[in-house]
Amino acid sequence: MIKVKEYRGHIRNWEELCERLDIPLDLTREEREEQILVKAYETWGNEMADHMHGMFAFALWDESEEKLFCLRDQFGTKPFYYYETADGKLLYGTTIRKIMEQPGFVKELNEEMLQLYLSLTYVAGEMTFFKGVKKLLPGRYLIWKDGKLAITRY
């Protein structure tokens, strides 16, 4: 069973996907997009982004595989962050605040990032102002399984 754990965004080609994935059109936007995410993952797996157009970032939990699958749209319109705890857990969310509210987060300033920002006035790459909190870069998906993290560009 696949569960949507986190979602932020909008799927622009929802009508086409509803037709292809046999999803009723009379659902609310929230229900419809949740079903699209689940059925697209069940149908296409890691390649689901090849079939979706829009701006989105999400996390799906695959109970049967005990695997977390997170994806960010190719343009990076919606953010997605993750953090590995000292005890081997993965915290994640579409905002840093969601990560900070979870047990296991250690709030520590990323001084290297602060120096870069003060020099360039721009935050680039996967680093954030909090040590250990990283951005999932645009056009990437993340898989967390058995305590191991793998990030792939799609």
Where are these regions (language model features)?
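Cysteine-centered catalytic environments shared across enzyme families
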Residues: 1-154
